[in-house]
Amino acid sequence: ETEYMPLSAAEYYAQFNDANDFYQKGPSFSESGNVTSTMAKGLKQDFFTQVDKVIDGNQNNVAVLRFTHAEIMIPLATSFELKNMMSPLPLTQTYNYQNSSWRGYITYGS
């Protein structure tokens, strides 16, 4: 039991939310052609451009900070392949905790 709902209900809603994020922002289907991580391509490229500038001594800033929402943070994390984040499922398989290690809370800490 949690303070607000039975543990079984909390687990159900957590898995439902992760499934929703998996398809809308995460790795999605194998057949999707990585469409979600493609959205983050520009941000990923800029990230490495900034790192290269630091390495080359051409960066005047201590850090380049960006504000973003889960709608782009999850695709960015997916494109970095963090903690097995880049594991799409076949179109014939439905996401659940038994067949995928992908979890939204790992990606954006909520």
State where each predicted segment sits.
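Non-catalytic terminal regions with compositionally biased, polar/charged low complexity
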Residues: 1-110
